[in-house]
Amino acid sequence: MIVENGEWIMQGVDWNDPTCIHSADELEDIINEYGFLPLFANEVEGFSVEEMTDPSYWWSGDTDVDPWEWRAVITRTGKITYGKFFNKKAGFISKKWFPYFANYKRDGYDFDSRYEDGKAEYRENLIMRLFLSSDIELMDIDYKHLKDYVESPELYSFEVKKLAGFGKGGEKNFDGTVAKLQMESYLVVKDFQQKVNKKGEPYGWANAIYTLPEYLWGYDHVTKRYKESPEESHNKILKQLKKYFPNAETEDLKRSL
């Protein structure tokens, strides 16, 4: 998005443009081809869902044509995850490419080790403790029977905020802390759902449902690039991005991540 005369203006292409993405299925194909894709325009021209879609359909509420609604459609496939992965901005990463981001963003650390070494904040730990068992290592979990090991493998955003003690009279900077955990690839969005009232009726805006990437795809898959240095993973991500945006400046490519 760009600002013109104090107003945010969506970028994009006309519906009839041959490069325009028209459906969640088409977007899923593009994400799997690229490996990863931010939602909104960034330092690299053309590298976003925004710039590949018709701006007039955003926030229309029509799942068939609204890219905002496609977030839920795509994450529910279990093949692609969503979160604030790109310079604190939201976007998608495919199952194939997530291990590269995990190794690069985590700098080779599982969360517990990161926290023990003083590289993660107290507030981050409050949130992660909701998802991590205190006596079972992630590598030892049978992910086909996840609920036998973990009480809450997934939680709504509002549940995370409440259970971790954020909000009025409690811990501050919930949004910033959750964004940091996503940027470090420890926390991801697996779906968006509305709240349900006592009658079982959905209401309000759709809420993000958070989980650990290990709970989506297993510890072995998420950490499979730990065998290489974070710098190697970073370089492979840049090489992949450069393949589709060969004219972009290297520094812009780095900033977009």
Task: Label each PLM-derived region with a short phrase.
Residues M1-L257:
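Long, low-complexity intrinsically disordered regions
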